[in-house]
Amino acid sequence: MAVWLFGGRLGLRGRLSACRLLCPRFQSRGPQGGEDGDRLQPSSTAAKIPKIYTKTGDKGFSSTFTGERRPKDDQVFEAVGTTDELSSAIGFAMELVTEKGHMFAEELQKIQCMLQDVGSALATPRSSAREAHLKHTAFQEGPVLELERWIDKYSSQLPPLKAFILPSGGKSSSALHFCRAVCRRAERRVVPLVQMGETDANVAKFLNRLSDYLFTVARYAAMKEGSQEKIYKKHDV
């Protein structure tokens, strides 16, 4: 996966000015790209297309944005991988949402871009980061506040909750509930990194608000589509 390898792919020396994430993909390859460690070579006459596979991760190690090699099951990569999974789930939900004409599809795409920034921040563990690394991967509070505004906008249009609801309410709503569950898992992967001082607390805040946003728009989609949300009922034996 290349989510955390932007710096490794381009090289750090003389290239930090290029270390901004581009929506919806990195300037190198996005999270669908190959393994880590491959560096783009200067073009001589014709541009060469880099290979998807590089074999540099065959021994079970990957590189962080700082260039540090860690096992692939390291907490950093667990967090990065789960946020990538979340973005993929949101991409699937977005297709269903778009088919139904929901206007918040544009917000979902923007959230995918935000998750790229989250991945970049997570892939820059502070224990091995220099100031230049942190400068280009800092995750600010702005996205958190934007999510809160969106949540308030849709919540004001929804009927109040009077019981626990089950993931339901049509395809769009159910897909968004699935995204919410993945988001909660991503948050659980990030919290230990925040507690260890390896990443910014704003990352955990963002994922926390994002799960609330996904819950809210799942209900909103069900309401707009006229689909009924299923209510939890205690099973009596």
UniProtKB/Swiss-Prot annotation:
It catalyses: cob(I)alamin-[corrinoid adenosyltransferase] + ATP = apo-[corrinoid adenosyltransferase] + adenosylcob(III)alamin + triphosphate. It is an enzyme of class 2 (transferase). Residues 1-26 form a transit peptide. GO terms for cellular component: mitochondrion. The keyword Nucleotide-binding applies. SUPFAM superfamilies: Cobalamin adenosyltransferase-like. GO terms for biological process: cobalamin metabolic process. ATP binds at residues 54-57, 62-63, 72, 184-188, 208. InterPro entries: CblAdoTrfase-like, CblAdoTrfase-like_sf, PduO-typ. The modification N6-succinyllysine is found at residues 205, 224. Residues 30-49 are annotated as: Disordered. Pfam families: Cob_adeno_trans. Its EC number is 2.5.1.-. Keywords: Acetylation, ATP-binding, Mitochondrion, Nucleotide-binding, Phosphoprotein, Transferase, Transit peptide. The modification Phosphoserine is found at residue 128. It is found in: Mitochondrion. Converts cob(I)alamin to adenosylcobalamin (adenosylcob(III)alamin), a coenzyme for methylmalonyl-CoA mutase, therefore participates in the final step of the vitamin B12 conversion. Generates adenosylcobalamin (AdoCbl) and directly delivers the cofactor to MUT in a transfer that is stimulated by ATP-binding to MMAB and gated by MMAA. Homotrimer. Belongs to the Cob(I)alamin adenosyltransferase family. This is Corrinoid adenosyltransferase MMAB. It comes from Mus musculus (Mouse).
